[in-house]
């Protein structure tokens, strides 16, 4: 018999302070310094971990202040039995797409199970001896960044095996707008598992609530979730899914990531541009991998030589990529955070992609990886529209019906004041 389970978002006044409204424009150079992440609220969630055997999904972004979450919990006497690692690995030093194996972490001696290697989802055997699962990873709010897919697989595993999951919410640095084509289910992959736009404007906690509420999980996980009761959890009252909210955060808030997010998202400017410039991964153009400004430099050796020039070379974040050792010509989209925000202007910017195709001399080879481009776009329509010379306005208009539908769904699951 399925036991009664509890899905709960921590909202009690004694535990949480509701997000405060901000009157500032989303285009501002300074970060909101008073934001407290879910992970930082140790006093709220420690009670649920004491005396338990823990499995934690974490990477280098899992910090409490200046200390890694794993170190924080171990110092507090929490028994971490296993660490699960996402794309780029637990320590965040693997290339994009690089398969990572299982190993024992040298610093802590704790086994690390990779969920971006031979498998993407924990097995029942991986978690059978655990009392509770914890998820604490900083996301960037973009559909094709794989951490939301990893979170979904982790959540499904928890539900399917009746293990409580504690999710420590973190701000989304790209949550100040919602834009892009909504994914066509025919193009479902690990870089896009659900019918959401490229930039969906939700924290990972809100996104998880949407997965639950819209029944977008596996059949078994959805069936288990149907038995939930919303109530106030205590150490003696089991919950099945618990979100620890951020404090002093809204979807207008500016949040500068305290830790480099991945080898190819080394600074906030790259994070802001990523929803737009990652589409270039499916083209013949370099997206700046192998430079100090990945996703800020865009170019190709055959573009006009009076354009911005850069030369990709192997580095920590890109051991192999496009056009190594060749001078590429194109765009430097970087600048200060405020300047980049003005360039992004709260939407997916298609103008660089459209212009690049227009001036590219060998049109037939522009979309060098068509299947990859379609997976990133979430459809096969965008490529056709660009080839047909459609304007940005025409393309954006084609997104609107599905985008409007998604915005209504999104609103149901927001835990923080919205940007509009």
Region roles according to the model:
Residues 101-130, 142:
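Glycine-rich oxoanion-binding loops at beta->alpha junctions
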Residues 1-28:
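Bacterial Sec-dependent N-terminal signal peptides
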Residues 185-205:
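Acidic, His- and aromatic-enriched active-site or binding-groove loops in soluble protein domains
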Residues 92-97, 166-188:
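Glycine-rich, charge-decorated loop segments at or immediately adjacent to ligand/cofactor-binding or catalytic sites
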Residues 81-88, 168:
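Short internal beta-strands
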